[in-house]
Amino acid sequence: MLDLKQIRENPEEVQKRLDSRGGSYDIAPILQLNQQQKALELERSSLQGRGNEIGKLVGQKVKSGSDANSPEILVLKTEGNEIKSKLAQLEPQEKAIKAAIDQKILDLPNLPSETTPIGKDERENVEVRRWGEEYKPTNPNILPHWEIGEKLGILDFERAVKIAQSRFVNLIALGAALERALINFMLDRHIVAGYTEVLPPILINSDSLRGTGQLPKFAEESFKCRDDELWLAPTAEVPVTNLYRDEILSSEQLPIKHCAYTPCFRREAGSYGKDTRGLIRLHQFNKVEMVKIVHPDASAQEHESLVANAEAILQALQLPYRVIELCSGDLGFSAAKCYDLEVWLPSANTYREISSCSNFRDFQARRANIRFKEKGQKGTNFVHTLNGSGLAIGRTMAAILENYQQPDGTVKVPEVLQPYLKREVIC
């Protein structure tokens, strides 16, 4: 959620940075409503001042011996009653304008950071670095992960359609074991890196989704329970960040670092026809998430370390990847700055996103009202929030099934996963 004060005091800069996203965002209605709000506040202040003045005059006159029912005092009392009536009429007007302003601000995305590249769409994203070129497989006949998975009997898409619908999968035997091994491996690595594990609810309320920015704009992307005001979590970012909603932390508590495994649920309403096969785009998938609640002064540094934590997982698995910095036109709604990690999928001869590491600055904190207090100082400030996939489990499995695929149709198990799977080969 953007700061109304920032919109009011720097309207041209705010509009310019919103325009760099490429959408249609207009702050003029907010400024107009704010002017009306200020006018009502001024009117209320004036009426309250006059009301206080009348009260003092009546008190003074009665104290000096005037009859409480004298014409002069009755005139003052009548005026006082009229003021009370006007103030009562102002209250709903002020509430309505405040609600309208809040709603319009809720509909605005975050401002791209000063260092985010300006661009229209993903074609103008900036490649930062690559890693693991030497690990790219040389086998020219690599099967797509869904084909090798079905041949090995570890991925079953057909029966998943029977049970649910398309974009679901059954993980069978070593497929289920590999999924579980990846989850445990990632959590173990993040815990060693200083994250505290959380296992949160995956049914979440609307306030939680508003807090992290999924509502109101992306309601159609989420699954909602029919009879309850609850939603299936699209990512662990939502429940974990909202652990601290409406709380005031001490600066000594920061940074707070959590990792969490959850199933994630997404309708993928805008992706019809994309990635219709395989594990890349499912309605239900598992993910390990990293979430940070940090001091604003440490925000940029914590973002870089978050990316490094995600990269460390890919490096340990020896999966080739590249780091992409998203341009302003490709940023997610809540992000001020974002790096995507893209893993190499040899069957498609391309890199595909496996982690998105975002710095939201105070955008989510304002929506979720997460603040902190500096020791010895008055008042509070909003924290900065960050999150990153560490990693998406299904996409990691897809990358392993392709990059570790052998000419004989087996798949080697990455060395770091062998203690979890108790085997060296999937066959």
Swiss-Prot record:
SUPFAM superfamilies: Class II aaRS and biotin synthetases (SSF55681), tRNA-binding arm (SSF46589). Belongs to the class-II aminoacyl-tRNA synthetase family. Type-1 seryl-tRNA synthetase subfamily. Catalyzes the attachment of serine to tRNA(Ser). Is also able to aminoacylate tRNA(Sec) with serine, to form the misacylated tRNA L-seryl-tRNA(Sec), which will be further converted into selenocysteinyl-tRNA(Sec). GO terms for biological process: selenocysteine biosynthetic process; seryl-tRNA aminoacylation. This is Serine--tRNA ligase. Residues 1-20 have a biased composition (Basic and acidic residues). It catalyses: tRNA(Ser) + L-serine + ATP = L-seryl-tRNA(Ser) + AMP + diphosphate + H(+); tRNA(Sec) + L-serine + ATP = L-seryl-tRNA(Sec) + AMP + diphosphate + H(+). PROSITE patterns: AA_TRNA_LIGASE_II. One of its GO terms (cellular component) is cytoplasm. Homodimer. The tRNA molecule binds across the dimer. Consists of two distinct domains, a catalytic core and a N-terminal extension that is involved in tRNA binding. Its main location: cytoplasm. Keywords: Aminoacyl-tRNA synthetase, ATP-binding, Cytoplasm, Ligase, Nucleotide-binding, Protein biosynthesis. ATP binds at R266, R267, E268, E353, I354, S355, S356. Residues 1-21 are annotated as: Disordered. L-serine binds at T235, A236, E237, E289, S389. NCBIfam families: serS (TIGR00414). Pathway: Aminoacyl-tRNA biosynthesis; selenocysteinyl-tRNA(Sec) biosynthesis; L-seryl-tRNA(Sec) from L-serine and tRNA(Sec): step 1/1.
